[in-house]
């Protein structure tokens, strides 16, 4: 027990010495904290330099994107120049066609005069031969009148089809106007979006500067917070070390308490055993006392009997002395005396034996009482030691509670600091998330613009498909007309008489159709100018509305698109040259007198109709409006001679086929390829934006994990 008390005192002295030696350790820890602060400061300076380098790289990327935009503007200027060159070439073609029309009108006037002469000659011959061929002429006239009725019926059907086609062309014109209005709206929207993007770019620059300043301030605050966190961490380490030592002392004290409890239990067991032995000894003492009392009573009784016997002996001796009895009586009395003396000796031996046993029992009782007193003293000392140990335990518990309160207070302060730091980090995350949200909004707007452009491209393709179908129908109708012309040429003599009256009307129609063709041609030219002006503006605005992307990503699609556009412009330049060469080969020759002129009106009306249809079908291409004049020239070339009609018709068809689809195929392919390239570029920009957003998310997660580990 004394060793246990000494160990507890030593533990108390060690804990007090540890508390007094904390100041030197705190000074050493402050030195280490200064070293760590300098190290962290160097790290943060390196990180700020890296961020400044990243900002420089981003500015370089912005400058490269601007350079790419300037290159695109230059390409757009080149395309505009090429379109102007094409427009000039088309105007030259129109002038040539107008000259050919003038020649054609002169030929028509000459044909009219020759037709009048031929008509007079035929009337004169008809009067001479009227008597001879009256019957044959009547049959032939009836047959030709039936054919004429059939042809008129077909012409009515063709007129109905022409009206239907005109209605379709009007609907297509309305659609084109609606598309033009939509394109104007889109251009205005693109201009407004361009302004918005410029304002957003300025705002983003100011925001970047503001964020850089915030970042610097945040870096300073983070450095200070890291210093504070390191100081708090060191303090926490000290407190945890103190707490660990206190816990070790507490465990040691608890172990000693357990050992003392075990010793107390052992002592209590010994005390119970001693109490049992004392109880047994007390019972034995009580029994010995009772036996002693009985022995004393027996001794008193024996002494009384001895005393009585002595008295009797004395009385007998006196009697003997007084009465001098006879010898037998004396012997008998002597024998009784001897027996009494033996009994007395025996009783004296028993008395001595009893006295000896009483002395031994008294000695045993004294020994047991001494042992009992010693055990009582030991129990008292153990109780005192237990009380002292309880007092020590209370003191240790109070010290532990005080240390825990101090530790809890320090932990609360650290938690408050950590909460403040986490709130600041959360605010930074919110700013980063807001920046990411603005980028996502821009990305969404860009996607919406790309979807709208795709829809416009799909509508444009549908319109092109409809135009192709209408062209196929026009070709089919032209083939039908040629077949009808061949059928009409078989009955040339009868039709000359029957259609002589309709020739003047159809010629007037032809003039009106030519005037209408000129008007349509001028309208198509104006529309083409409008579309050529709107398309480069739309492409430029679309290029300006796109996000800037890295340098190595932009050069590949721009080079490919430039190469494709160069090839397409070369094709466009080559094709008008071919068409001009092809049209220069055509020469309008005068018709011989044998050609039936009545074929021309019906053959000229329908090609002019088809020319009007083809002109309206492709409002964005001025060359499509010249198909009617080409077909008129083909009819004139076909009417040179009957033996060569089929061969010349096939040759002119082979030569005139590439003239009509030339502008639609070249410019349509250019527009389609340009739209495809713009779609690829928009997809690539979206992928780059997604990758950049993913990198920002990863960096923010790394920062959050880093500060989470520090906490």
From Swiss-Prot:
Coiled coil (UniProt feature): 23-192, 224-535
Entry's Gene Ontology cellular component terms: centriole; centrosome; cytoplasm; spindle pole
Record's compositionally biased regions (Basic residues): 572-585
GO biological process: cell division; centriole replication; de novo centriole assembly involved in multi-ciliated epithelial cell differentiation; DNA damage checkpoint signaling; signal transduction in response to DNA damage; spindle assembly
Keyword annotations from UniProtKB, A to Z: Cell cycle, Cell division, Coiled coil, Cytoplasm, Cytoskeleton, DNA damage, Mitosis
Source superkingdom: Eukaryota
Predominant localisation class: cytoplasm
Cysteine pairings via disulfide bonds: none
Residue stretches of biased makeup (Basic and acidic residues): 548-571
This protein's record includes keyword Iron-sulfur: no
Keyword Protein transport attached: no
Chain spans, region Disordered: 529-585
Subcellular location: Cytoplasm, Cytoskeleton, Microtubule organizing center, Centrosome, Centriole; Cytoplasm, Cytoskeleton, Microtubule organizing center, Centrosome
Comp. bias regions, Polar residues: 530-545
Family according to the record: Belongs to the CEP63 family.
Role this protein plays: Required for normal spindle assembly. Plays a key role in mother-centriole-dependent centriole duplication. Plays a role in DNA damage response. Following DNA damage, such as double-strand breaks (DSBs), is removed from centrosomes; this leads to the inactivation of spindle assembly and delay in mitotic progression.
Annotated protein name in UniProt: Centrosomal protein of 63 kDa
Lineage: Eukaryota, Metazoa, Chordata, Craniata, Vertebrata
